[in-house]
Each structure stands twice: as C-alpha cells, then as structure tokens.
A protein has these predicted regions:
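A short, exposed loop/beta-hairpin motif centered on an aromatic-Gly-Thr core
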Residues: 300-308, 332-335
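Surface-exposed, low-hydrophobicity interaction/linker segments
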Residues: 29-81, 299-303
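Short, flexible, solvent-exposed loop/turn segments with mixed acidic/basic and small polar residues
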Residues: 80-90, 321-324
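Helix N-cap motif at beta-to-alpha junctions
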Residues: 101-105
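Short Gly/Thr-rich strand-loop-strand
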Residues: 113, 119-151
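An acidic, glycine-/histidine-flanked metal-binding catalytic module
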Residues: 1-34, 38-41, 155-288
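Short, mixed-charge low-complexity intrinsically disordered segments
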Residues: 326-373
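A short, charged, amphipathic alpha-helix used as a generic interaction element across diverse proteins
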Residues: 309-325
Length: 382
C-alpha cells in the first residue's frame, strides 16, 4: 500500500466533506488514496476465498460463495451513517458471502471457522455478530465474522465473512430490489413503515419455516403440511395474524388499479433482469435508467442516460411523476446503472432468488388463508 493509515483516515473524512465537491484536486487525491486502499484488499480477499472454499466443502458442498470489494458509493454511505466510523478501521472493505442450505449447515461452518487462527485475535477472541440468534430490528438474519488475511505484500487485511441460509439470502435480495426501485433505503432503516413491517414479518415466518423438518430435509410436501398445521394451531394465533398481515399486504391492489404489490415486485425483478442484460451486453454506459411501467399491460419503457446527463434524466423523471401522478396505471422509477451492477455483484442470482422468495410468500399466503378460517371456525364453536 502506497499510503499511510493516517492518509487513509484523512481520505475517509474528506470523502464526506462539503469541500470535496468544489475542490477538484482534493477529489482526485482522495479518490486516489481510496482506490489504493480498496485495491490493497484484493489479494487478501482472494486468499480468504481459497481458505473458505476448503472449509465450506466440509459443511455444504453445494454452498454458494461470492466475494466483493466494497463499492465507493457504499463506503461513503457507511461513513455518513456512522459518526465514529473511519475508513482505515472499516472492516468490510473486502467481503465474502457464503450461502448454505439451512441453519444447521451455517452453524457447522461457523463452528469450524471459530477454531481457525485467522479469525482469532492475539488474545484468542472472535470478532463476530450473530444476527441469526438475535436478528436486526428489520428482520435481517446472518452471521458476520471478521478474519485477517495477508495481501500480496504481506500486510494483514480485515475481511468480513457473512454466513446465511438460502432463505435468508432471498429475503435480503428482495429487500435490495425494493430499495433500488422505490429509493426507500429500507436497508438503512428508512422508508415506509408498511414495507418495514412486511419484511420484518416475513423474516419471522421464514425463521419458523427454516426450523421445520420438511425444510431441513428438503421435503416440500412435508414442509407445506407442517407449516400450515403450525400456523393454524390454536396456540399460534399471533403467528397466524402475522401471516394474514403478509397476505393482505401483498394482495392489496395499488390505488386505482387491480395490480397488487406482488405483481409490482415481480415486474421490478423482471425489469432489473432486462436492464442488467442490456448493461452486460455493453449497450448502456454507466449512468441512469428511466423506467415507465404500465401496471395494467405490463409494458416496460426504458430510457438510458449517461452519467453526465443526470440533470436531464432527473428532470424527465420529475415530469413523468407529475404528469402521471393522477394515472395510477403507471409506475415511474429512475435507477442508477451502477446500482444495478451493485445488485448483480452482491446478489449474482438475484432473479432466481427473488422467485424463491415469492414461492415462500405463496406458502405464507396459503397458510394465512387456512389459519384464518380455522380460527374463525374455532371461535364460532366456542
């Protein structure tokens, strides 16, 4: 690494300073330091991936592993979000995500990693957070553990390893897709309360599903019966109420149309898939994509703008929002092609993952229906 930790720390402060937007020299110097700092993690990340592949094989030979260097946009957001955060101490510049079949395999891998020196401090302690045992307020579930791996010049670099199940991963993928199109920042505890409640309740139901025998043994028919029986049981009225709230939220029609939240989300996922293909084919440069989705016909119109054309894209977006405000048949969104690439990088199988997410939402809807009417019948009988 060409720069000292003091210079890296200063670059972190400068990244979120007011002066950086008006001082070209400061911007250039800061971005140069940031790029070098990020790049110094690349070979350490490769070493971490090699190390993990051997361990993962012992826990789940069908596990999915993805690595990434934290994007500049995400680094800036994190620095702004946490007052005491510094660039030099940010522990997830390099990150690896391991997606395993179920919680049993997640715990098996976690226990294996806990014994490895690369995850232990000099005094033998672990630096980790278990959001599966204690989920975040929004319902996020995963295990984060910090390891130290050497880069190509022998420097130790922090690498964050995230362990989660496929269902936990599908939940996170779907939240990212909603954030991308609605600009709510649910991930940062911002946005509409009804969406926060939806994802929190879904996380609760997913936790129940993951602990059922049918899920652990991948027996779909057994799982469906087990889950419906669980939800409709007389002692689980609160669980049934949560399932009903999820059912009502995703099936309610959007104002002025017969189009549901579920259908809108699926169109978002399909739109993202279409945009991503255009970007990957090199037909769209870095910049912005303006979408107009007709919720009655399912037709999607897209316009691509280069990065320098943001003002034009923003003005058109505002115009469409204003002119279509009274017409509930249209949904308008302005998304960054860079953000689309970010989802692909963090969630390479996002399209398939979103389908898995909604397949389990369908199960929750089915259980809500059966549970509600079973409960009604019980109340009448008593």
């Amino acid at each position: 690494m060409r720069y000292t930790k003091k210079q890296v720390e200063k670059a972190g402060f400068d990244l979120i300073s007011y002066e950086i937007n008006s001082d070209a020299d400061l911007l250039h110097q800061t971005m140069t330091v940031l790029t070098d700092w990020r790049d110094s993690h690349i070979s350490a990340l490769d070493e971490a991936e090699k190390f993990l592949k051997v361990k993962v094989e012992k826990a789940d030979n069908k596990a999915f592993i993805a690595k990434r260097i934290k994007r500049t946009e995400s680094i800036i957001k994190k620095l702004k979000r946490f007052n005491k955060m510094s660039l030099k101490n940010m522990q997830d510049i390099g990150g690896i995500r391991v997606v395993l079949a179920n919680n049993g395999k997640v715990n098996q891998l976690f226990n294996l990693l806990c014994k490895e020196n690369v995850f232990l401090s000099e005094i033998g302690s672990l630096k980790f957070k278990n959001y599966i045992k204690e989920p975040k307020e929004d319902g996020y579930r995963s295990i984060h553990i910090i390891g130290r791996f050497k880069n190509n010049v022998g420097e130790d670099k922090n690498i964050e390893v995230q362990l989660r199940t496929q269902l936990q991963h599908c939940w996170a993928t779907s939240l990212e897709i909603i954030d991308l199109f609605t600009h709510q920042n649910l991930k940062l505890n911002q946005g509409k309360p009804e969406w926060h409640l939806f994802f929190k309740l879904v996380s609760n139901q997913f936790e129940i599903i993951e602990n059922l025998r049918g899920f652990k043994t991948n027996s779909q028919n057994i799982l469906i019966k087990e889950y419906i029986d669980f939800v409709k049981h007389k002692d689980n009225v609160k669980i049934m109420d949560e399932a009903v709230k999820i059912h009502n939220f995703v099936t309610q029609p959007l104002a002025g149309s017969n189009y549901s939240i579920e259908e809108l989300f699926q169109d978002y996922a399909q739109s993202l898939h279409s945009i991503d293909k255009v970007i990957l084919q090199g037909k769209a440069k870095q910049g912005y994509v303006l979408l107009r989705l007709n919720v009655l016909t399912g037709n999607l119109d897209t316009e691509y703008f280069e990065k320098s054309e943001y003002a034009e894209a923003s003005n058109k977006y505002s115009l469409y929002e204003t002119t279509l405000a009274e017409n509930k048949s249209w949904v308008v969104a302005l998304v960054s092609s860079n953000a689309v690439g970010g989802i692909r990088e963090a969630y390479p199988n996002y399209f398939a993952d979103s389908k898995v997410f909604w397949s389990y939402i369908s199960l929750i809807k089915q259980a809500a229906f059966v549970g509600y009417y079973t409960n009604q019948a019980r109340n009448k009988a008593s």
